[in-house]
Amino acid sequence: MSENRHTFEMEELISSTGKGDDPLSVLLLANEGYTAGCCADYIRAIRNNSSHEVTVRNPIPTSRLDKLLGRPRVGLKDEQGRDYDVVIIHYSICILIRDYVPRYLRKSLRAFKGIKIQVIQDEYRWVNR
């Protein structure tokens, strides 16, 4: 098991942003078109019930042309060009599939200095990778 895994209390993570009681800007990478209804409910619940500003983006191409043209291009900055405070990767975005998380986004996620959270649903999926 990797020694790079850390567990923090949510309050500790939030205090590290320096925003105090201000809402955080959160990017939720998720596939809202996922076929399971519970998945869409989960994504909606995060977006609609959070006290923070949550933006949902789907980095998965929807067509062969999108894939060839590198669309959609999801950045880690909001509409005003500011870095998000938090990036959440929902389980509908399988990070082990290159088409789901393109190279440019992997590079951006590695360099991202904010809070990164990955929500895993199936803990038995490819446990050897």
Regions found by a protein language model. Name each.
Residues 3, 16-17:
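Compositionally biased regions
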Residues 17-26:
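A short, charged/proline- and glycine-enriched loop
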Residues 8-9, 14, 27-129:
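Extended catalytic core of nucleotide-activated donor transferases of GT-like folds
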Residues 1-7:
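N-terminal acidic, proline/glycine-rich, low-complexity intrinsically disordered segments
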